Design a protein with these regions (language model features):
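Interfacial loop-to-helix junctions that mark the boundaries of transmembrane helices
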Residues: 2-8, 73-74
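N-terminal signal-anchor transmembrane alpha helix
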Residues: 6-29
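Membrane-embedded catalytic cores of phosphoryl/pyrophosphoryl-handling enzymes
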Residues: 19, 23, 42-153
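Membrane-embedded helical hairpins/re-entrant loop segments and their flanking transmembrane helices
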Residues: 29-49
Length: 153
C-alpha cells in the first residue's frame, strides 16, 4: 500500500506541493522575523502544522491535485470534481478564514476582559484573517509547478 502511494503521481504531486509551500512559508517567516530556529521539533511543527501566511499550502495542494489529474487523466469527470473542490477550498481561504480571524479577535478581547474582571488565566487564540490574493496565487503557482514536475520528470 505504501509503495502504491509513493508511485502515485496524484499523491506525490500533493505531497511535494504541500511540503514545498510549507518550507517556503518557513523561509518567508524566517526572513520577516529574522529568527532562525533549526531544531527538529520546531521545523516539523512549522512545516506540518503552521497555517496562514505566504504561500497558501491549501491552495498549492488542491491545485496540484487538480493539475495532476488533468495531466494524467485529461479534462474529464475526475478533473471537474477536483477542480470544484479546489475552487471551494481556495474561496474559503479568503472568506471563511477571514471570519474565523475576526471571531478570534473578539474571543481574545473577551478573554482579556475576563482575565481582568474575574482573574481567569487564558491563552490568546492565533488570529489569521484569511489569505491575501498574492499568497493564494503563489500557492496556485507552486501547485501547478509541482504537478508538472512530478508528472513529467
Amino acid at each position: 500500500m505504501i509503495m502504491a502511494l509513493l508511485t502515485n503521481d496524484l499523491f506525490l504531486s500533493c505531497l511535494v506541493s504541500g511540503i514545498s509551500a510549507q518550507v517556503i512559508k518557513y523561509g518567508v517567516q524566517t526572513v520577516k522575523t529574522r529568527k532562525l530556529k533549526l531544531t527538529p521539533v520546531h521545523l516539523l511543527k512549522k512545516i506540518f502544522l503552521e497555517t496562514g501566511g505566504m504561500p497558501s499550502s491549501h491552495s498549492s495542494t488542491v491545485t496540484a491535485l487538480s493539475t495532476s489529474i488533468a495531466l494524467t487523466e485529461g479534462i474529464g469527470t475526475n478533473f471537474i470534481i477536483a477542480l470544484a473542490f479546489a475552487l471551494i477550498t481556495i474561496r474559503d481561504s479568503f472568506g471563511v478564514r477571514y471570519m474565523s480571524g475576526v471571531q478570534a479577535e473578539y474571543l481574545n478581547a473577551l478573554s482579556e476582559k475576563l482575565k481582568k474582571e474575574i482573574k481567569i488565566d487564558t491563552t490568546k487564540i492565533k488570529v489569521v484573517k484569511g489569505h491575501k490574493k498574492k499568497e493564494v496565487l503563489t500557492g496556485i503557482i507552486i501547485g501547478i509547478f509541482s504537478a508538472y514536475i512530478v508528472c513529467y520528470l
